[in-house]
């Protein structure tokens, strides 16, 4: 796939900007806070309908405007695709494919695939479990767009179940009050059983897919990790689901959920929140039989994240049948020359790559000669 053009209107600090991509590699050079990351964020939004920086659409719209717009033309093996995303300060966003507004955002996902690698990703190893769950979920959405719906269903069930648990806890705290209806409490506990089965059903879909994708990603990451580390380090990736299960069979996984929910029922009612489910999953990275989160050096952690990103690229290509875009956001400065060369050699001309940087010193002459170089200043992009 090849991204031909991107047009931004009232997006972040861009009032009106069109970018034509004329090479397999594009380097965007400029000082900090000029809009480099915003351009890559726009491409990321077209790929995943999510930003890894903010959660509200209003934060993506230029200050003073009511709507922002991202338009793009993409060349796929099957032909051209025109992508559009309208973001609103208030109200729902609109997704447009080939000039037709789509009723379901799900139908937009999977048209453009991209792997984002920013300096924020270097926190993937030492960061919170939530950051690792978000990482694997973003990859899954690109490999299997229906997963976005599956994940959304799970979190809707979780929200409703938490609200009911909170209500039950409040009723139990007020149980000394003679005016409180024990019948109401009994009804709520009966209703909780219905949410238990919903949680087990939707949660099992999430956990089974996470396990499957990590099973496919791990050997690719291990191969890249061995190459980058000079085969001096051995990488293991362990999926640690909150609900343990052994066989990838829907009913058995659901049963494992229900059994754990039953075991934790009293604790959940006392806490007023759900403690069972994939929202509490963990993914552990181990280097030479030692958890990288606690003991990995900064260099080891960067090698690990670089291996993960290269594995993502190749897994998406394997599943989708076309190489995805690679978005490198100010990350080269964070890597030493050896890791920079490993990354640049791995990319070659196989993946269309957009790279942001504050200076061109990191690039070899041959790379600069084969790249389109753009400069950016105050939300204005020009040829370098």
From Swiss-Prot:
One Pfam entry for this protein is SMC_N
GO cellular component terms, A-Z: cytoplasm
Q: Which cysteines are joined by disulfide bonds?
A: none
Q: Which family does it belong to?
A: Belongs to the RecF family.
Binding sites annotated in the UniProt record for ATP: 30-37
Q: What is this protein called?
A: DNA replication and repair protein RecF
Its function?
The RecF protein is involved in DNA metabolism; it is required for DNA replication and normal SOS inducibility. RecF binds preferentially to single-stranded, linear DNA. It also seems to bind ATP.
Q: Name one GO molecular function term.
A: single-stranded DNA binding
């Amino acid at each position: 796939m090849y991204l031909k053009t991107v047009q931004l209107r009232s997006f972040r600090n861009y009032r009106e900007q069109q970018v034509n991509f004329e090479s397999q590699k594009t380097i965007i050079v400029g000082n900090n806070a000029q809009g480099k990351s915003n351009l890559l964020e726009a491409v990321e939004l077209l790929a995943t309908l999510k930003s890894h920086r903010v959660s509200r659409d209003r934060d993506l719209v230029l200050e003073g405007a009511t709507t922002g717009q991202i338009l793009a033309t993409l060349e796929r093996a099957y032909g051209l695709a025109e992508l559009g995303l309208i973001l609103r300060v208030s109200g729902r966003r609109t997704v447009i494919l080939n000039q037709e507004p789509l009723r379901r955002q799900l139908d937009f996902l999977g048209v453009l695939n991209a792997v984002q690698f920013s300096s924020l990703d270097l926190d993937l190893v030492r960061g919170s479990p939530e950051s690792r769950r978000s990482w694997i979920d973003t990859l899954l959405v690109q490999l299997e767009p229906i997963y976005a719906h599956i994940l959304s269903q799970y979190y809707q069930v979780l929200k409703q179940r938490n609200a009911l648990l909170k209500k039950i806890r409040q009723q139990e705290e007020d149980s000394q009050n003679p005016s409180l209806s024990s019948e109401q409490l009994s009804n709520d506990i009966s209703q909780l059983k219905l949410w238990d089965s919903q949680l087990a059903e939707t949660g099992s879909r999430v956990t089974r897919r996470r396990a499957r994708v990590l099973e496919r990603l791990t050997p690719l990451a291990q191969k890249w990790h061995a190459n980058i580390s000079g085969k001096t380090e051995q990488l293991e990736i362990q999926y640690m689901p909150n609900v343990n299960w052994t066989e990838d069979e829907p009913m058995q996984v659901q049963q494992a959920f229900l059994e754990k929910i039953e075991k934790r029922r009293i604790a959940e009612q006392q806490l007023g929140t759900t403690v069972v489910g994939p929202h509490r999953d963990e993914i552990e990275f181990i280097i030479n039989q030692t958890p990288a989160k606690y003991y990995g050096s900064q260099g080891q952690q960067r090698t690990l994240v670089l291996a993960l990103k290269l594995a993502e690229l190749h897994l998406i290509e394997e599943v989708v049948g076309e190489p995805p875009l690679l978005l490198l956001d100010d990350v080269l400065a964070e890597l030493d020359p050896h890791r920079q060369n490993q990354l640049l050699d791995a990319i070659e001309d196989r993946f269309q790559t957009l790279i942001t940087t504050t200076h061109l010193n990191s690039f070899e002459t041959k790379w600069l000669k084969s790249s389109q170089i753009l400069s950016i200043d105050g939300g204005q992009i020009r040829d370098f």
